[in-house]
Amino acid sequence: MPDDARLIEQARSGDSAAVDELLARHQQQVLRFGRQMCGNEEDAREVLQETLLAAFRKLGHFRGESLLSTWLYQIARSFCARSRRRAVGEPAQTEPLEQPEAASVPSDAEPPDDTAHAREMGIMLHDAILALPEGYRDVIVLRDIEGLSAENAARALGVEVGALKSRLHRARAELRARLAGAAE
């Protein structure tokens, strides 16, 4: 965001309206990231709350070496990992009847068969991404879904750009294989 730097400075000087605006600007992208990484709305909303609270508390530690969104993704990623660790050993979660947020829902102008097919494809893609190992899921979500540059995604993951590109290549290959297996 163009004037995040101005808002960060205002927030650091105690302007609560600047803090509110700054966090509100990034709320949707953090929630979307949480949905993709956690796989369900409830955990994603919890990750969003924890991320925004942590960002509020630690805004003074943000050095500005990367975009604020990159810093927020790093925070959210750690909370997603905690959420997944808590879920280990718990019974499988039931999926709500509503479609996952990641599913693409075309406009009403499309024929019902096309709409159903697109929804089915969206669900398959969502499930295939969730089935990827964490390191692959992280890179797919940051680069291909959130659209971060290779540099910002590498910063968010704490890896070199070359390592990120290599991991992205392997992640895309595994995702293609999973989707091809699901289509059979």
Question: Model-predicted segments: where are they?
Answer:
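DNA-recognition helix of helix-turn-helix
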Residues: R77, A81, I145, A150-E151, ...
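Sigma70-family region 2
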Residues: R12-S13, G39, E50-L67, R85-V88
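Arg/Lys-rich amphipathic alpha helix in sigma70-family domain 2
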Residues: G60-G64, Q74-E95, E110, A118
